[in-house]
């Protein structure tokens, strides 16, 4: 029965579409990723609108966000937004605020970094499809995606802890506000210098050439593929972690800068050479120098 081919002609249109998705792991994975990215952007956008309602106009796009309608949302999302947008660390329910900040940063990672992992995931799907055509076992691509996202979930813990540290030591008015003076300049300086480093280039090369890595580490064991996803996530983190520091200089809930960083990482991983990295690094260093001069 499993070897028979079915055209699902007795199902309605929706049923045939669902059967087609279920039969094609590649399509199912791409749909899952697409929905996840859209959902992450929706939640971040809704949170940014809520944050703009109670903040003075200052950051780019604040006026636009203030004029956008605030959508009615379920109560659990309102509570999640309130924990993330609290002006300072909460003394009472602080135990819930820390996981909320981790989830906020993880949503940023899904929104900005998962699209740039599309070549990796697409390449794995192609290899898996070829293996199945030959009758060989292949681990579902979502196992690879889960490993990749697990790396960014771990990184989100670090970024959320850094959020609390920056608020405590950088003198920001509110917890997610831009880091001012030396703290903001330091974030830009580190991000800018890293764009010229050999480690950045080594990680970028791994992200740009997923086929050789996947082919050399191919396995039919889910644990091995999950670990492969973790490793590829580490390479991506090594490539992009410094860019995430820019969010501390512009404000963690600045969705316009989120989109710009996501677009840059997508372009950087699809191109060759170091031009994009060096241009970005130069801009960040000039920006850091300007911020230092202004705050002096």
Description of each model-found segment:
Residues 99-126, 146-155, 193-218, 222-269:
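Functional transmembrane helices that embed catalytic/metal-coordinating motifs
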Residues 134-165:
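Acidic, low-complexity central loop/insert segments
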Residues 26-38, 172-197, 276-296:
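Selective transmembrane alpha-helices of multi-pass membrane proteins
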Residues 50, 118-121, 165-173, 201-204, ...:
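Membrane-interface elements of multi-pass transporters and channels
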Residues 166-187, 245-273:
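Hydrophobic alpha-helical transmembrane segments and immediately flanking/interface helices
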Residues 164, 241-251, 278, 285-294:
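Interfacial helix-loop-helix junctions of multi-pass membrane proteins
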Residues 2-106, 130-133, 171-176, 201-216, ...:
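Histidine-/acidic- and/or cysteine-rich, low-complexity loops and terminal segments associated
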Residues 29, 33, 97-101, 140, ...:
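Residue-level signature of transmembrane alpha-helical entry/exit and packing/kink sites
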């Amino acid at each position: 029965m499993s070897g028979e081919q079915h055209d699902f002609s007795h199902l309605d249109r929706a049923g045939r579409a669902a059967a087609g998705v279920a039969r094609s792991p590649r399509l199912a994975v791409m749909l899952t990723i697409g929905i996840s990215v859209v959902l992450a952007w929706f939640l971040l956008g809704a949170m940014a609108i809520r944050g703009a309602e109670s903040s003075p106009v200052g950051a780019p796009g604040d006026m636009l966000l203030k004029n956008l309608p605030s959508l009615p949302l379920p109560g659990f999302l309102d509570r999640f937004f309130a924990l993330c947008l609290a002006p300072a660390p909460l003394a009472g329910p602080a135990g819930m605020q820390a996981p909320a900040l981790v989830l906020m940063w993880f949503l940023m990672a899904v929104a900005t970094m998962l699209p740039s992992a599309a070549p990796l995931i697409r390449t794995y799907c192609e290899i898996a499809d070829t293996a199945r055509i030959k009758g060989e076992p292949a681990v579902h691509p979502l196992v690879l995606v889960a490993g990749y996202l697990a790396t960014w979930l771990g990184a989100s813990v670090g970024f959320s802890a850094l959020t609390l540290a920056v608020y405590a030591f950088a003198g920001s008015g509110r917890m997610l506000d831009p880091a001012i003076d030396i703290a903001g300049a330091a974030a830009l300086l580190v991000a800018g210098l890293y764009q010229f480093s050999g480690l950045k280039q080594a990680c970028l090369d791994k992200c740009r050439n997923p086929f050789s890595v996947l082919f050399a580490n191919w396995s039919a064991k889910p644990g091995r593929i999950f670990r492969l996803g973790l490793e590829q996530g580490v390479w991506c983190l090594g490539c992009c972690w410094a860019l995430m520091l820019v969010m501390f200089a512009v404000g963690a809930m600045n969705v316009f800068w989120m989109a710009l960083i996501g677009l840059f990482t997508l372009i950087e991983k699809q191109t060759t050479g170091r031009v994009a990295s060096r241009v970005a690094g130069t801009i960040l260093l000039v920006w850091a120098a300007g911020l230092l001069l202004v705050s002096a």
